[in-house]
Amino acid sequence: MSGNLQREALLKEFENAGKMIHAFDTAPEGNGEEDTITELPVVKNPGLGVSSETKAENMEDTGFPRWTEFFAKNETVSLPNRNFTFNTYFQVPEVNSSDLSSIPIFLAHHGAGSTGLTFAPLAKTLKEDLGTNFGFFSFDARGHGETKPLDPTDVTYYLNDFVTDFVELIVWFYENYLKACKQSKLSLILVGHSLGGSVCANLYEHLPEYIKRHTTGLAMLDIVEEMAKFVLTKVDHFLSVTPNVFGSAKEAVDWYQSHNYSKLKESAEISVPALFHKAKSGKVVRITNLASFKPYWDSWFDGLSAKFVSLPTSKLLILAGNDNLDKELIVGQMQGKYQLIVFQDSGHFIQEDVPKKAAISLVDFWKRSDNRNVTIKTNWGSSQNKTLEGKKTVE
C-alpha cells in the first residue's frame, strides 16, 4: 500500500472520535478463522527499591473482581532515584516445581491511560494454561493508577523516563524474586501494549547483561509507529468527548462497554475501575490526565518500527482488526525479521478483548523462541523424545 493510500485509510479509520484509539468491531472472541499468523523467524538470543504489601483497595467496594483473582502479589515498590513509588502486580513461578526445560517470565508494560490491571485477564488465562510454572509482572506506570511521585513538582513523561522506570523495576523483580529460580531455566519475555510496546523495544539495550542473557523475546500488542503518531493528533478531540467523572464504578464500566472500548465484560470489570479513584462525593474520577502528557508525545514513538525490526532477539507483533503496517514493518516482515499475528475480532486492548488468543500466542512465541523447549522425535534407539538444542520439531 502506498504512503498516500495508507494515510487515506487511516484518516477514514480515525475520523470518528469514538474510533480514535482503534477501529472497534463488535464481534465477541471467536474461533479465529479469519485471524492471520505469519511464521516466526529463527533468531539466536544475543539501586534496588524497598517494597511493601499494598494494604488497601482504591475501589474495594465496587463489587467487581479484585486483583487477588489474577495475581499472587500486589506490592508498592519505592525507587527514590526514580522519584516514584510503583504499584506492582505479579506472579512468581514455584521454585523447583517445574519439569519444564525453561520457565517463562512475562514482563508487561501497559499503554497510555491504562494501568497494570489491563493485563489481569491475560495473566489469569496464562495461569490456567501453565499452572504455577510461569511468572508475570505488571505495574502502573508513572502518571497512572496507584503509582505515586515522591516529589510531584519534578515529574516528566519522556519515553526515556518510562524506559528507565521499567528497567529498574525489572532489576528489582529479578533480584528479589527471580534469583530464587534456577537461572538456567529463566526465559524472560517482554510484553508491551501500545506505548508499552515502544517502552519495551527501547529498553532492551539498557537491560543489564545478566538479565539480557535470559531475555528470549519481545511481543508488541497493537502498536505501529505511523498509526500511533497519527492517533496522537486526534487525542485532544478524544479527550473532549470522553467523561472523566462517573456516578459509580459500575457506570464507568457500562460506559466503556457501551462504547466498545472493552469487548469482554469480565475484563472491563477488573481493568476499568482501576482507571478511577473514588471521591468524597462518592463519584469516581479518572486518575490519569492524558493532556498532561502532550509535551512529551513526540518522544514516544519516533523510530519505533526501525528499532523493533532491528532488535537482536525474537519478536512478535500482534495487531487488532487490521494489518496496516508502515514501511519499516513491511520490509521487516518480508525479510522474516518478526512474527505477525492479526486478530480480526479484537479491539485495541488485545490483552483484554481476546485474552485466550493472546495467551496462546505468547506461549507459542515463548516455546518457539526458546531453543530449550524444542525437541526432535526420533524413530531410532528409543521411543522417548530426545531434546536437541537449536533444532525444530520433526515427526
Swiss-Prot record:
GO MF terms, alphabetically ordered: protein C-terminal methylesterase activity
Pfam family, one: Abhydrolase_1
Active site: 194, 222, 348
EC number: 3.1.1.89
Top-level division of the source organism's lineage: Eukaryota
Catalytic activity, reaction form: [phosphatase 2A protein]-C-terminal L-leucine methyl ester + H2O = [phosphatase 2A protein]-C-terminal L-leucine + methanol + H(+)
UniProt name for this protein: Protein phosphatase methylesterase 1
Family: Belongs to the AB hydrolase superfamily.
Swiss-Prot/TrEMBL keywords: Hydrolase, Serine esterase
Biological role: Demethylates proteins that have been reversibly carboxymethylated. Demethylates the phosphatase PP2A catalytic subunit.
